[in-house]
Amino acid sequence: MIRKKRMSKGIAKILSGFLVFGMVAGLVPAAPDQTVHAKAADVSKPGVTVYATKEQLMTAFTPDASGTNANVGKLLFGINASDTAQGWYILGKDNGVQGDNTIIFAASPIATGKFNNEQKNKAYMKDYGTYTDGDSAEECAANHYGASNLRVTLQGMASNKDYFSDAEQTLMQATTVATTDTKAKKDYTTTDKLYALEGVRDAIILKAGSDNSVQLQRSVYWSEDEFWLRSPYESSYLGSYDYAANCTSTEEQKVKDKYVDETKAIRPATNLNLSNVLFASAVSVKSGKIEEAMTLRLDGKNKGIGTATYNVLKKEIKVNRGDTADTVNLIVQYKSGGQETLYGCPIERSQDVKLPYEDVDLSKCKIWLETTSDGLIYAVEATEENGGTPAEEHTGSHLIDLPQGATWTGINSLDNDLSAGYYYLTDNVNLTETWTPQDGVVLCLNG
């Protein structure tokens, strides 16, 4: 069972309802030797960098014109050459790609390699790219990205199960990018699932996306590695630098040129189809933690996972497990006292689940069931149970028969001088210490 909870003393939100948390009916008088304690009830929705909806994956992380964003989101997708999960920066929707999608850019090297194996020109072939003027080139220089070994390496990765499972490969979409042929002095386009970024010499901004619309500031996205770009080195000396291509420089912290047969890191970009994605979350069942990077959760309604509903008043989650033979986990993610928090447990049968923390407002939590298949996580989001009473509504007077002549009295503060009687709170109360009721005081709380 996964249980992560960071408690902090602070504001307690006390509402009208039942005195005993979780009771279905009945009130219990608050006797003098009983106390109501301040509780860590500052519960809110998780932050966007640890839980992002499909819409947020397309909009919340897009860098601005300066190449930065206050929200820097990461996603785990695929495996790198070191056989560890590959992290990617989330860059937002590419308007040049149809449907719901997001660009992602490798946050660390996925592998290493050469731009080209040799400093030699090649005869032009159709597969090397389509020239925007409708013509073609006779010969490609060694720094021609379309004809490069770097591009061949990326094409191989995109279809290699050692890097991306079959299911992951179906999410990767081709992007058409334009690159300059310095030898022919014109632009050409290539279309691939994985592609290298663009960056001109001495720049501190790299560009991603089908029309280079996404700009990436060095200090935020690419200061730590030297990796190949698709841009050739452009020189005023004809032919002098046909064997040099651009890459990032950690020493000079900008784009520089290197000979094509040198070995550098490979940090490509790709585009993910989000049409079947529900959300992304940094919750990891494997580690039992909220990680630095999120993982996609795809629609699992046809995966036999089951369904879940939650009741805000009862603080209860009902799970109807499906017939899948795969492991199913219940996840509850939220923020408590400013700290990202999760609760999770495996679901082996249909059951009712109560969180071990009485102060959690389920209406502010993200709740779902999930299972993993072929490297992807599939989820079914919980829905709120129909019926029940809104949390802000006083309920005790509707359910309890008071003694003859007694009435409910609304109060907006807790006063130790309250006389014997039946009370409910008309407003939230900031409780900084314990409160002890007097004899005969019955206080109705919503637990």
Where are these regions (language model features)?
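N-terminal secretory signal peptides that target proteins for export/translocation
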Residues: M1-G10
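N-terminal extracellular ligand-recognition/capping segment immediately after the signal peptide
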Residues: A420-V441, G447
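Extracellular interaction modules
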Residues: I14, F18, V255-I266, W435-Q438
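Sec-dependent signal peptide cleavage junction
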Residues: V24-S44, V283-V285
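Sec-dependent N-terminal signal peptides of Gram-positive bacterial secreted proteins and lipoproteins
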Residues: G10-P32
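Collagenous Gly-X-Y triple-helix signature in extracellular proteins
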Residues: A41-T327, I331-T372, L376-E384
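Extracellular "leader-to-stem" segments immediately downstream of a signal peptide or signal-anchor
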Residues: I367, E385-Y422
